[in-house]
Amino acid sequence: MLSDSEHKMSVVVLFGGMSSEHEVSRVSAGTFVDQLDRQRYELLTIGITKEGRWLYTEADSAQMADGSWEELPGNMPCVLSPDRADHGLILFTPAGQVEKVHVDVVIPVLHGLWGEDGTVQGLLELAGIPYVGCGVLASAVCMDKAVANAMFDASGIPHTKWLSATRWEIESDPDGVCDGVIAKLGWHIFVKPANAGSSVGITKAHDRDELKAAIRLALANDRKVVFEAFVDGHEVECAVIGSDPAVSTRPGEILAGAEFYTYDDKYKNGVSQVVIPARLPEEKLDEVKTYAAMAYTALGCEGLARCDFFVEKDTGRVLINEINTLPGFTPISMYPKLMEHEGIPVPALIDRLIALALERTEKQHG
């Protein structure tokens, strides 16, 4: 049950969520639960089911990962109060009582829609509770690949050729959309839901029939589709932390087990490999680092993010792919591996992220 500790900072790890990345979130959150320094922090865990129910739980990381946390007898329905006077949670106990719990900081370990897209961040801003990671605007912009690509273009950050189309545009003139995409991008074409992460719903199309099928899959995951020209290059990723200034790590490289870095590659079959630092010349590693900090700053990121790039094999051009404002923290995830390579183990990283969250709130209200 909840303790009355006064000397420890109360930290909520918020996990699960209603997105297609629910399972990944549960595993990522387990890392925070296991690595949080219990001598310094009072841990509170709140799970969000796929149906959107918020439950206070005392589940351990294994129960979170396998999904059994939802059935634990000690779970209690809860809400995060937007009332700044509450500054925390409201629990509904089995005895029918209402219990208020003060919260000092929230770690929203929520990947994808309804968590990484500015929605939960907006709730936390209303509540006046410090939280780890990017703010409302950066979270929303980076979640939408079309908006992020437009921002990259406006900021002069090199990106592969791209187009986007809404469901209405596609359904109104499907052949016209396909013609326009093929004419601008050529083959091959990556087709992506605008608002999805972890490679969910992404297809590489090699011909018109595959393009049509890829569009149908993307529309099953979102109402807007992004089309990007294929890049034959190294897939590299930088971890970025802080703001004013943002600090980026040396990039790591993904050696994908398929034609591209799929959801299964990332989280299931384990055939992909990670190489740190990336297999690139030193000056190219520095160039990627520079672009990572530029992109992070241009899109208003704070706290942490992972910036993903392609480095073309023929030309050496560095092209940004996307920014993930709440990168994975699973045992195979790149962000914590990159930080560990810089000499920052996960417990120290969590301490730093919490400190950054508190610093931001102090600057806003100080």
Predicted regions, residues:
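ATP-binding N-terminal substructure of ATP-dependent carboxylate-amine bond-forming enzymes
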Residues: 1-137, 141-143, 147, 166-179, ...
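Glycine-rich beta-alpha junction loops
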Residues: 49-52, 169, 195-197, 231-234, ...
